[in-house]
């Protein structure tokens, strides 16, 4: 919580107003933010200064792991996070590549699991990483990226948290995740849960110890219609101790994550929080 609250306060104190063309709103913005999550000691970075809905965040990332490209599949997992971008984004609604209701196009997990090569074949970035790590291999390129400029027009949204790099020191696994843009009041709440959980899951299915996860954000911002709630409500609250995340130990392979895992396989204990804050969401 310390890094999160420091970032929120930094944006309020030092941020510069920037017009955002996509949303038509102004954002109070800072450049370069670093957060660290202690996965080894299970310090689950669940926001305590407002109620945080962690299941939706994990469900969304599980959908990425499975390479889903349809908002309906994400809803089945337990999250509606792609409903708006798939069905209410005017640019995507008018895109000839859109296949119909709930179609997201070639975004996020599609790129991670089926990156297209010039010859039409695909690369499964995630499986390569899992296979290497299970065999104790770190080739300094254990990288999964969703950022494919050659196919931006084939999806409803460019990836915000776009690249994940795994590093192995002995039998301890580390993760560094890169994010080009972050809606701090809403998006960061999800993203830090996902970074933590991704490292925890990958360590579990590759038989390694989880170390720390490093989260690097380029453009961190608060939208103008979120600022009052952040300054006068959330930042006035004292944080509670962090909770712990418990993952079903029967999850042992990538195939498990692809097939039978549900939100019932994740539990959070020791979570105390303040009341929810309804921040506006910008499509």
From Swiss-Prot:
Pfam families: Thymidylat_synt (PF00303). GO terms for cellular component: cytosol. (6R)-5,10-methylene-5,6,7,8-tetrahydrofolate binds at residues 183, 282. The active site is at 160 (nucleophile). Its EC number is 2.1.1.45. Signal peptide: none annotated. DUMP binds at residues 22, 180-183, 191, 221-223. GO terms for molecular function: thymidylate synthase activity. Pathway: Pyrimidine metabolism; dTTP biosynthesis. Belongs to the thymidylate synthase family. Bacterial-type ThyA subfamily. Catalyzes the reductive methylation of 2'-deoxyuridine-5'-monophosphate (dUMP) to 2'-deoxythymidine-5'-monophosphate (dTMP) while utilizing 5,10-methylenetetrahydrofolate (mTHF) as the methyl donor and reductant in the reaction, yielding dihydrofolate (DHF) as a by-product. This enzymatic reaction provides an intracellular de novo source of dTMP, an essential precursor for DNA biosynthesis. Homodimer. This is Thymidylate synthase. The lineage of its organism: Bacteria, Pseudomonadati, Pseudomonadota, Gammaproteobacteria, Pasteurellales. The gene is thyA.
